[in-house]
Every structure is written in C-alpha cells, then in structure tokens.
Amino acid sequence: VVAVLRPSSDSEINLEVWLPPAAEWNGKFQMVGNGGWGGSIQGLESAMPAALRRGYATAGHDTGHRGGGEFALGHPEKVIDFAYRAVHEATVQSKALVGAFYERAPRLSYFNGCSLGGRQALMEAQRYPEDFDGILAGAAANPHIALHAGSMARVTAVLKDPESGVPQAKQAFVARAIMNACDGLDGVKDTIISDPMACRFDPSVLRCKSGDRDDCLTAKQVDTVRRNYAPTTTSQGALVFPGLSFGGGRGIPTGEGGPPAPLILDTFRYLAHQDRNWDWRRFDIDSDPELARKNAGFIDAVNPDLSPFKARGGKLLMYHGWSDPLIAPESSVRYHASVLDRMGSDQGNWLRLFMVPAMGHCSGGSGPTSVDWVSALEAWREQGKVPDTIAASGTGATGARMTRPLCPHPQRATYKGRGDTNKAESFACK
C-alpha cells in the first residue's frame, strides 16, 4: 500500500506499507527507520524485506521530504515532520491500514532503526510512548545538532589547513598503532578492543622524527588525530559532543575534497542560518549550534524521562558499535546514563544498552559483529527473557570464525583465562 500523509498544510510524507498474506502474518507490525537526512523510503531494500520474512506487516516512509537538508529552507512544518511527526503519523496510519486489511489490529508493534533511525527510535519512546511495545535504537544520530557541530569542528579545522589532513594510508597505520597499544587491555590479543574507554593512546608517539613518511605523523597530523578522539568543546570548555572511540582508527579527516559533506553542512546552512549560500568557513562552535537549537532544537531526542514508555510495558534495546567512525559511541552511553540519572539506576528490566566491540556504523566490522537484535527484543517483550547476554558472531582479522557474548553496559565480555578465545563460552560478562 502506498500513501501520502499531509498532517499540516505543508506536509507530504510518503509512506509504503507491506502486508503479507493473512496466513503468513505473525500478527505484529514493524516500522523501520531512516538514515542520514532521510529523504526516501530507505527500508525498501533491506529492513522491510527482513521484517516481511519474519511475518511482520511492515512500513517505511521518507521523513516528509526528498533529498538532503535543503527541504528545511522556508519550510518549518517539514522540519517538524523530519524531527518527529513523520514517524508518528506514519505509524498511526500504518497500524490503521494493517487493522483494516486483516480485520484486527496488530497484537504488538515494534520500531527498528539505526543512525537517524536510532534518533527516531528514541524520539518515539520520548514523545509517543503508546506507538510501540518494543523499540530497537541503534547508533542514534543524537543529539542531531551537537553531533553535526562536532563533525563540523573536526572537518573544517582540516579543510582550512589541508596539511593537517591524515591520508587513508596513514589512517591504516594509526589504526594498527591503536590496536597494538590497547588490544591486550581485555586480557586477550585478538585484534578486538573490548573497552575503548579504557584505552589511553597518545598519538604523539607516532610523530615523525624528521620529514614525512607513511609510517609516522607530522605535528599537524598528530593534532588532527588527537582532535578526532577528544571531545569537541566550546571556547569555554563546555562539552559539545564526545570524540570518536579508540575502537578503530578510521573516520579521521583527510583534508581532501571540497566543503564539508552535506550531511553535516545542511544543519548549519539550513537549520541555523537558513541561507543556502552560507560559507562553512565561518562556522563558529559557540554560536552556530545555539542558533540551530533556537530554530529547531526539537530535532534532538534528549528527554531522559521515559516513565510513560516504561509504565505501559515497553522495552527499549539500544546498541552502538565501538568502532563507529561517524557517530561517537559515547553519545549512546551518555544518553543511557541520563535516563538512569533521571529515573534511577535500576532500569534493566525494560532498558538495556549493548556496546559492540569492533562494530562500525550500525553493522559490519572485523570480528563478532553480526547480531540478531530483533529476536533478542522479541524474546524480551514477548517471553520475558531479559537479555543478560546477546550472541554475536563474525569473522576476525585473521579469518577465523568468532563468537562472543555481548554484555549490557557497563559490563564487558571478559576472558575466563582458559579455552578458545574464538568461542563465546570462553568469555563471561563482568
């Protein structure tokens, strides 16, 4: 079923709902999330087919616009759609269509999203706790404005001084140096850094003694690497957004190419300055994020009070890869902590965060990074099986098949001191 939703005079939300034959329907509904700036029904190729194979009625939408962030220029209602309204309206109308088609409402509804979809997931739990019974929130691009401010600060510093860029060849060298320094902190040398927050790598040890080679860094490149992993702060030292984690050595600005990618640039030229010709060289870490928040602060899913979602029996399963080169993994740790600070430390019966060693952005990576998140969430919500561990599998850097338990944050998978380090049974959550 294809539909266009118009909850405001300037709304145009494109929605697609897939309905399996009645005999194959599992009685449930799954909404899938978006990525980047949305702008298309991005679940059509992967997420929606996966949901359909499980027997779900499933839906996706385009967040209320086409393309990148340029839609925000002169269209405040479309900004609201992108921020939160499109997901909610698409969910309400999709469930109505499902009910009409099968002549009964879905018995349970789930949301499954990563990146922008992760922010959408958190926004649903915060604003519309009645929409979903279980929510899967991966690598949330959140807070949207602070995330893009941190990226702008790192990228523009290098674009203004191209000699400070770190070429891809050197990024591989940096990644190896980080691995050599921190791989063994978890007790096992297996090319997996299980707890990057415990890594205290100092990039100055890579500085060239003379000249410039692929196996060392210039002084300016050392500063760039340090900036990449350090938190972005205002001129007064206030945190803007965490730095990337030492779980990997990628995502360092190269200094190559033109202006910052539209993904991050659009937040400031359209949301903040509302000027398509705004010059990125004028980016100011103190004033520009504040201007964006003044105009569209509702885009950030930062409310830590999820009491209504908890009260109706909802389950929120968060995850983030420690080697994410796009969104600092610590951002998920910080939001999870904010909920515990607000609601109390004992929330594990409905809220859990799993940090995945070696996983990149949303999925992939060299190691046990393949995870059946949906089954874990289903078992939790439908059978009361609290995910004390979740199984992960994959291929390591040496080509060996690996399995390992994922542990609810802040626990880590710890080697028992005996057994095959490629097998999950040799590890315990501590």
Which role fits each region the language model picked out?
Residues 1-430:
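C-terminal His-loop and adjacent cap/lid subdomain of alpha/beta-hydrolase
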